Regions:
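A short aromatic-rich beta-strand->coil structural motif
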Residues: 112, 118, 197, 209, ...
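Long, internal low-complexity/basic segments
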Residues: 30, 95-97, 106-110, 117, ...
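Active-site-proximal cap/lid insertion segments
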Residues: 103-107, 117-123, 150, 234-262, ...
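C-terminal cap/loop subdomain of S1 sulfatases and analogous C-terminal strand-loop tails that border
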Residues: 219, 225-237, 387-393, 432-435, ...
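Active-site segment of extracytoplasmic enzymes that catalyze sulfate/phosphate-ester chemistry
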Residues: 114-115, 121-205, 216, 235-238, ...
Length: 603
């Protein structure tokens, strides 16, 4: 049972009573009464699923000449294997002709702010009252938002490039097939949403976590291409929120353990300063705010150390699943959760929701600052996470990377001009969709390697023409290999990462490893490589071990009954073929395949 806090908070805790009331709603989430297992609630720089048709509308190629600000001392702003000024516009399915710089340069192009939390699950949203009041109630929620690979570096790379992991080749958090050293060696930083928007005349800024292992094989002062302003940890213990160093536009600045050094608050302060400085600048901006919270160790901010003293992790029907005989071997190898493990899970849950209070404050500060400088009405604000997180479901202690709903389904809320307030839309949206969506808002050209599609039409109630009917999910291991991709993917031939880069690449912020729970889940418990299809009413998974999972989510939302062994063999053949087609596809071809109708479970 989920215990709601009843004791008076410590003097330093300044939470609203609304947060307490919201936490009570977790009872419903953990009681099994909900239809959804996840309980979704609603200084200047120095480096200068509804049914839909199956056809895909083609985009229109445009030419964007890089602005003077499109390059910096760190490298070319756009380099995707073709001249930047002739990159073809992706056939991103929007139902309308993609906007171009020529179309909108004379108009009032919107500002874009992306708040990307780390390891946030949907179960924790009820403890964020400011998020609800300022985002959920004022914007649009996407209950079917999924991530391709439920892991930090692959997810963030997909976000920046608009590509699935099998196409951008960022598969894990560390070498040989992931982490910053690998990303930098591939050269994919040279063509991202940052370079595209900067070339289109946007001021771009990142404040917070970039990619796991950054800066790894480059200097601590290195600023990746496309960023006008840059504030990201390069050393120390950023995950602890204290005792870290930031690369601030090419200058390394140390932060200590004083209350004012708390990283989430520092990010918020720099964000509001950037917005205030933007008030008199006619150029639109893209502000990327990737927080470290609530990633472990989930250190709470100074004001919230005593919040939610009695809270326990939600106990859904999937929590500490008793009968796992139908699950793949890696799940069967895990014994039921011991009492000590459950206590540890509850302790981590409390710290996570404590740390989220500072993220809630950040949201409020950003929105209030936008309102104060007159920019709110022309700014899209997006709130999401890099991946989901499990806390006891299916016998797993804590972490991500599994194919289950807790890990692959994430929060996504969008507020901005023309967005219907307090609404929810059902079509599938994924982390590969941010880049083409932002590009459409900005009137920027996107390269043809982009796999995602703009969800901008959904925000204004437009039809999801030729929209995806399934979403590709995957998990990779250190042994996973992908050869050189075809030129159409925009990824140059694989190059060996810098010698010695493996340890650095697997150690975020040059000294902070991923949590022990994640290492245990990915290695000790041996989650094999898998690929899967998340359809409207079911999910299908194939493992490298030849095992399969199939869940009827309409009848079994908590994924307790694997029906793969009793399913119609013809259906399994169809699903396997569709999965294979997607694993080989990229760009417009990928969008065509994923928009094809999915076979029903019952034939």
């Amino acid at each position: 049972m989920c215990t709601v806090p009843t004791k008076r908070f410590g003097r330093r805790c300044a939470l609203k009573l609304g947060a307490l009331a919201a936490l009570a709603s977790l009872e419903a989430c953990s009681s099994g009464s909900s239809a959804s297992p996840t309980g979704t609630v609603g200084a200047a720089p120095t480096n200068g699923a509804a049914a839909s048709p199956t056809t895909v509308s083609a985009g229109v190629a445009t030419t964007v000449a890089p602005s003077a600000a499109a390059t910096s001392g760190t490298g070319s702003a756009i380099a995707s294997g073709r001249p930047a000024t002739t990159a073809a516009a992706s056939s991103v399915t929007t139902g309308t002709r993609p906007a171009t710089v020529a179309n909108v340069a004379g108009g009032n192009r919107p500002n874009i702010i992306l708040i990307n939390t780390d390891d946030l699950d949907t179960k924790s949203l009820p403890v964020m009252p400011k998020l609800k009041a300022l985002m959920t109630d004022q914007g649009m929620t996407f209950p079917n938002y999924f991530v391709n690979v439920s892991l930090c570096c692959p997810s963030r790379s997909a976000l920046l490039r608009g590509q699935y992991a099998h196409n951008n080749e960022v598969l894990t958090n560390g070498n040989p097939n992931g982490g910053y050293a690998h990303v930098h060696a591939l050269g994919i930083e040279n063509s991202t949403i940052a370079t595209w928007l900067q070339a289109a005349g946007y001021r771009t800024a990142l404040m917070g976590k970039y990619l796991n292992g950054y800066p790894a094989s480059v200097a601590d002062t290195f600023v990746p291409p496309g960023w006008t302003e840059w504030y990201s940890p390069v050393a120390g213990n950023a995950y602890s929120e204290y005792n870290y160093k930031l690369n601030e536009n090419g200058k390394v600045v140390p932060y200590g353990k004083k209350p004012e050094d708390y990283l989430t608050d520092v990010i918020a302060s720099k964000a509001t300063d950037f917005i205030k400085r933007s008030a008199s600048d006619p150029a639109p901006f893209f502000l990327y705010l990737p927080t470290y919270a609530p990633h472990g160790p989930a250190t709470p901010g100074p004001k919230y150390e005593n919040a939610f003293p009695d809270a326990k992790a939600p106990r859904s029907p999937a929590y500490n699943e008793q009968d796992v005989g139908d699950k793949p071997q890696w799940v069967q190898n895990m014994p039921p959760l011991a009492a000590k493990q459950q206590t540890t899970i509850d302790e981590l849950y409390r710290k996570r929701i404590q740390s989220l209070q500072s993220v809630d404050d950040l949201i409020e500060n950003v929105i209030n600052t936008l309102k104060g400088v007159g920019k709110l009405d022309n700014t899209y604000i997006i709130f999401t996470s890099d991946n989901g997180f499990h806390l006891g479901e299916h016998r797993e202690t804590s972490g991500k990377q599994a194919p289950y709903e807790e890990d692959i389904r994430l929060p996504l809320i969008v507020r901005g001009p023309g967005v219907a307030a307090g609404k929810s839309v059902e079509p599938f949206v994924g982390n590969v969709d941010f880049a083409p969506t932002f590009a459409q808002w900005a009137g920027a050209t996107v390269p043809d390697f982009v796999d995602g599609r703009s969800f901008a039409p959904l925000l204004s109630g437009g039809a999801a023409d030729a929209w995806r009917q399934t979403f590709l999910i995957a998990h990779y291991t250190a042994e996973s290999r992908r050869g050189n991709r075809p030129a159409a993917t925009g990824v140059p031939p694989r190059r060996q990462a810098t010698p010695g880069g493996s340890a650095a690449a697997s150690t975020p912020a040059n000294g902070v490893p991923e949590t022990d729970e994640e290492a245990e889940a990915a290695v000790g418990r041996g989650i094999p490589e898998f690929h899967g299809l998340r359809a409207k009413d079911y999910v299908y998974i194939e493992y490298a071990t030849k095992e399969r999972e199939l869940y009827d989510l309409a009848k079994d939302p908590y994924e307790l009954q694997n029906i793969a062994k009793t399913a119609n063999p013809a259906l399994l053949t169809q699903l396997s073929a569709r999965l294979g087609d997607l694993q080989k596809a990229s760009g417009a071809t990928f969008r065509t395949v994923e928009a094809q109708p999915m076979p029903p479970l019952a034939s």
